[in-house]
A protein has these predicted regions:
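Active-site capping/gating regions of soluble enzymes
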Residues: 2-13, 75, 88, 105-122, ...
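Short hydrophobic alpha-helical runs that function as membrane-insertion/retention elements
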Residues: 29-30, 61, 91-94, 225-231
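N-terminal capping/small domains of soluble enzymes
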Residues: 1-45
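Conserved, mostly hydrophobic/aromatic
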Residues: 19, 65, 128, 219
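Active-site beta->alpha loop and helix N-cap motifs at the rims of alpha/beta catalytic domains
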Residues: 34-120
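Generic enzyme active-site microenvironment
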Residues: 63, 93, 127-130, 203
Length: 329
């Protein structure tokens, strides 16, 4: 199998369609979070795990992003979600860190989950570890974590693990569309050495807003194997509607009210008084793209929206591919 160097969040149907088309010529993965697509539905196109998988087919590699307890829309143990993931996804990111107090606790939960899921589907691949925003760890801690997994899992089970998440300093500010993480190249080097020592591939999360400054390429030059990018692609669509609605004061106000009332900005914005109406829309518009109110009141005013949006998304995918194509996994 040719493993993708970049994985894209399915922020909307337009993003999914563009990734599928891109996947006809290039290796790429889709990384639905549980809030986007889950066994019980999600905010992206009303897809559930099965219908999403059936729509995408085998055009791209499907990876559950942040699978597990407390990762869905409502608090749960993640079991039902994992059971469906086993049937339809190629790769599952096992991430119990949100429910873990220590890295040992996370390791024990990871082991338990992998043991259970490998029985249900022996062809499943796994990604382990998590991003800095959820649980920060050092290279030495990742060494301990992976060593513990290798000792407690069977050889076959451990061999199903393909990726370990590294933390070189990424953090997103959706309101300003910037990556405000403090990138540390020496830290990345240490993480990559750790991961390679276990014959695994390194993967960085929150790789948004790095392509234009060639910071994605910098990471691959140092040996990074794969990167996740999500909100940035949803914001391409948000930007299109924001630009269009700003030409009509009433339409802009309706878009703002829909976004504000969704409450989805609260995850990303601590003090709403510090951002503009435009920034609030850019922060959370992608969450409401499939809502009936948005479709009727906003999208209906833009008959050629999907075609124009997909053109922008495809251009961004081409640029990402250009910056990563010379690096081999």
């Amino acid at each position: 199998m040719k493993y993708p160097k970049y994985y894209i969040g399915p922020m909307s149907k337009n993003v999914v369609d563009c990734v599928m088309k891109h996947g006809q010529q290039h290796s790429v993965g889709l990384i639905p979070s549980r809030r986007q697509v889950d066994y019980c539905g999600g905010y992206v196109n009303q897809w559930n795990t099965r219908t999403f998988s059936e729509y995408v087919g085998d055009t791209v590699l499907l990876c559950r992003d942040h699978g597990g307890e407390l990762q869905g829309k409502d608090p749960d143990d993640g079991v039902e979600s994992f059971n469906e993931d086993c049937k339809y996804f190629d790769l599952i990111h096992v991430d119990p860190f949100r429910a873990s107090k220590t890295i040992k606790d996370a390791a024990e939960r990871t082991i338990q989950i992998i043991k259970q899921l490998s029985v249900q589907n022996s062809n499943l691949m796994f990604e382990v570890g998590t991003e800095e925003a959820i649980f920060k760890y050092e290279p030495e801690q990742l060494t301990w974590f992976l060593t513990y997994l290798s000792m407690e899992l069977t050889e076959n089970q451990f061999n199903q693990i393909k990726y370990a998440v590294v933390q070189s300093g990424t953090r997103l500010d959706l309101s300003t569309r910037t990556n405000i993480g403090n990138f540390n190249n020496k830290r990345l080097d240490k993480f990559i050495q750790v991961v390679k020592s276990f014959d695994l591939m390194s993967k960085e999360h929150n790789g948004d807003y790095l392509t234009d400054s060639f910071d994605v390429e910098v990471r691959f030059e140092r040996g990074l194997d794969a990167i996740n990018i999500a909100p940035e692609y949803g914001q391409v669509e948000s930007e299109y509607y924001l630009e269009g609605c700003k030409k009509d004061g009433d339409l802009f106000e309706r878009l703002f009210v829909i976004c504000y009332n969704s409450g989805k900005w609260k995850k990303w914005v601590k003090d709403i008084n510090r951002i503009s109406q435009d920034q609030l829309i850019m922060t959370c518009c992608h969450y409401v793209l499939s809502d009936q109110q948005f479709i009727e009141e906003i999208k209906s005013n833009f008959p050629n929206a999907d075609k124009l949006i997909q053109k922008r998304i495809s251009s961004k995918l081409k640029l990402l591919n250009e910056q990563t194509k010379n690096y081999c996994i």
